[in-house]
C-alpha cells in the first residue's frame, strides 16, 4: 500500500522541480507560470495526503478551493501574457518592466 511517506516524497519532488524551474529559467514567463502551478500542485498533494491520513475531509475541500483559484490565476496570467505578446512581440521577463500605466 502507498503510505504517507510516498505522497510526501512526490510532493517534495514537485516542489523542488517548481523552485528549480523558477530559478533556472528567468526569461520565459510560460515556464515560470508552469513552475508556480507545480508548486501549487505539491501543496495540494500535501493537503490531500494529510487529510486522508488523519481521516478528515477539510484538507480535500480546501484543495478544491486552491485548485479553483489556481485555475483562475493561470487563466488571468495567460490572458495578460497573450496581450503583452500582441503589444510587444516578446514574452521575455526583462521586457515586462516596461508595462507602466
Swiss-Prot record:
It catalyses: a quinone + NADH + 5 H(+)(in) = a quinol + NAD(+) + 4 H(+)(out). Its main location: membrane. GO terms for cellular component: NADH dehydrogenase complex; plasma membrane. InterPro entries: NADH_UbQ_OxRdtase_chain4L/K, NUOK/Mnh_C1-like. The chain crosses the membrane at residues 4-24, 30-50, 65-85. It holds the Pfam family Oxidored_q2. The keyword ATP-binding does not apply. It is a multi-pass membrane protein. It is found in: Cell inner membrane. It is an enzyme of class 7 (translocase). It comes from the Bacteria. Keywords: Cell inner membrane, Cell membrane, Membrane, NAD, Quinone, Translocase, Transmembrane, Transmembrane helix, Transport, Ubiquinone. The keyword Lyase does not apply. NDH-1 is composed of 14 different subunits. Subunits NuoA, H, J, K, L, M, N constitute the membrane sector of the complex. NCBIfam families: PRK05715.1-2, PRK05715.1-3, PRK05715.1-5. Belongs to the complex I subunit 4L family. HAMAP family: NDH1_NuoK. This is NADH-quinone oxidoreductase subunit K. It comes from Cereibacter sphaeroides (strain ATCC 17023 / DSM 158 / JCM 6121 / CCUG 31486 / LMG 2827 / NBRC 12203 / NCIMB 8253 / ATH 2.4.1.) (Rhodobacter sphaeroides).
